[in-house]
Regions:
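Residue-level marker of positions within ordered structural domains that often coincide
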Residues: 27, 51, 120
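Donor-binding/catalytic cores of nucleotide-activated saccharide
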Residues: 1-32, 63-66
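A structural signal for well-ordered alpha-helical segments within the folded catalytic domains
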Residues: 20, 41-44, 109-113
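Catalytic donor-sugar/metal-binding loop of nucleotide-sugar-dependent glycosyltransferases
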Residues: 32-34, 44-62
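C-terminal subregions of glycosyltransferases and related glycan-biosynthesis enzymes
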Residues: 59-222
Length: 222
């Protein structure tokens, strides 16, 4: 998928990971986060080490975002700029950027870059050749960064255009579904399994509401 999301990958970001597992990643790469986006890079690396992991259908943590975070910038459509101007990225990131990716910082490109770097540093370049779909990155880039489309024009010459078109259509569909969910949430207060709860002002009130209305019950842990 071109690292378009975490999917069901194990994650230290909003997750709990055994220290010995993290140490194995460190011993193989010299870091716990072998890529410019720590969350995606660590998730990819963990997926190559972890033998078993599980998901709890209950929030044990809350993802934070502010106007200056990547998520906040994305919500304001300010999540695109030249790599050289992304001052928070690790030193040398621009010089070592993958040549098959647009030399531009967006959610699509930095996650793909992080996944590719993690696979390389974990000595799994075979997965880059057999599994990684760079056309998925191009398709999403055309949807979310259309005004900068000239940045991938040369890359499209060596790409599978049917795969790019498929990713492009899929990204538009996902964008429409997200818009529809937000619209129904704000108008009728629900969208599928999602509910909008009003008059909650901070994370403490949120935790109390969830604890009182959806108490966790774990009868057996294996």
């Amino acid at each position: 998928s071109g690292a378009s999301s975490y999917g069901k990958l194990p994650c230290v970001y909003n997750g709990i990971v055994k220290r010995t597992v993290l140490d194995e990643i460190y011993s193989r790469t010299g870091t716990f986060f072998p890529g410019p986006s720590p969350d995606m890079a660590n998730a990819i690396a963990l997926s190559l080490v972890v033998k078993k992991h599980c998901f709890l259908d209950y929030p044990v943590s809350w993802a934070g975002a502010c106007v200056k975070s990547g998520g906040g910038m994305g919500a304001m459509h300010k999540h695109a700029l030249p790599i050289e101007d992304a001052s928070w990225l690790p030193a040398g990131c621009a010089e070592n950027w993958e040549t098959v990716l647009p030399h531009f910082w967006t959610a699509a490109t930095v996650w793909a870059e992080s996944a590719m770097k993690a696979l390389r540093r974990m000595d799994r370049e075979d997965l880059l050749r057999s599994k990684f779909c760079v056309e998925s990155v191009y398709g999403r880039f055309l949807v979310y960064s259309f005004s900068d489309r000239q940045r991938i024009r040369s890359l499209l010459k060596n790409a599978s255009l049917p795969k790019v078109a498929k990713a492009y259509i899929s990204a538009w569909f996902s964008r429409f579904m997200a818009f529809w969910k937000n619209l129904t949430l704000t108008t009728i207060g629900r969208a599928g399994s999602f509910r909008m709860i009003k008059d909650i002002n901070d994370v403490v009130e949120c935790e109390k509401y969830i604890h009182n209305n959806y108490p966790i019950k774990i009868e057996k842990w294996t």
